[in-house]
Amino acid sequence: MSAVIRVDSLNKTFARKQALFNLRLEIQAGEMVALIGASGSGKSTLLRHVAGLARCDRDNGGSIDVLGRRLQASGRLSGEVRRLRADIGYIFQQFNLVNRLSVLDNVLLGFLGRMPRWRGSLGLFSAEQKRQALEALARVGLADFAGQRASTLSGGQQQRVAIARALTQKAEVILADEPIASLDPESARKVMDILADINRHDGKTVVVTLHQVDYALRYCPRAVALKGGRILFDGSSEYLSEGFLNELYGAEGDTPLLFSDRARRGAESQPELTLARA
């Protein structure tokens, strides 16, 4: 089966400091994959390259294909990048909504990649597009907020609006960069539940960067662990051992963040997660 995402020998250097080292990765259609690792490990940098938001090195930079089409190679984006981006939904950590617009108008922006630019610039959305946008908001539990300004919503609600926008975009691949990093545990669970539902019921490929490993274990069957710009683990999440995770994140600093959800809530509403032993 052809990979939906294929990363081949990807290298990236910032100001003479290499951030990604010869990364190779294939993700198949319908997978839900977590990219995990400490801050600065390269997981967000990798995701931005897969989205076409960053370019690999010009010399020996490698290549990235998405949905069977070349996205970029050797520091150059493909001429098809605009059409490819229409098939790639990107969810940012800080929501990336237009605060002065209504919730509904923000969701309607998901249609821009699939309509003439002049119509989009004038905000000429059809009645059918508005119906679909309201349907997407209903799916994330926010239909009643359609007329409110985006700035009035909580962080968790804004992130769900961003997911609704990806639904109207009709993206085949959804990339989410630390979508729950700034959210409280209840909001984080709602966001991850929605992403998992999109993966299971719509068959969309979902790749999400996560800092808290308990969410990766709970929601993502496959995990890819990065450290220092290199892939150290790629396989079933159930085989992530405590010893490996301590090595990945370090014995101090990042380690307390790994299971912050369970630490804050206790285990009364979720089954205990057991890590595989090395």
Curated annotation (Swiss-Prot):
PANTHER family xref list: AMINO ACID IMPORT ATP-BINDING PROTEIN, PHOSPHONATES IMPORT ATP-BINDING PROTEIN PHNC
Localization terms from the record: Cell inner membrane
Binding site for ATP: G37, A38, S39, G40, S41, G42, K43, S44
Membrane-spanning parts: none
EC code(s) of this entry: 7.3.2.2
SS bond partners: none
Originating organism: Pseudomonas aeruginosa (strain ATCC 15692 / DSM 22644 / CIP 104116 / JCM 14847 / LMG 12228 / 1C / PRS 101 / PAO1)
Keyword line: ATP-binding, Cell inner membrane, Cell membrane, Membrane, Nucleotide-binding, Phosphonate transport, Translocase, Transport
Function text: Part of the ABC transporter complex PhnCDE involved in phosphonates import. Responsible for energy coupling to the transport system.
A GO CC term attached to the entry: plasma membrane
Major localization listed first in the record, in broad terms: membrane
Domain ABC transporter: 5-253
Reactions catalysed: phosphonate(out) + ATP + H2O = phosphonate(in) + ADP + phosphate + H(+)
NCBIfam families reported for this sequence: ABC_phnC (TIGR02315)
UniProt membrane topology term: Peripheral membrane protein
Record protein name field: Phosphonates import ATP-binding protein PhnC 2
Subunit structure: The complex is composed of two ATP-binding proteins (PhnC), two transmembrane proteins (PhnE) and a solute-binding protein (PhnD).
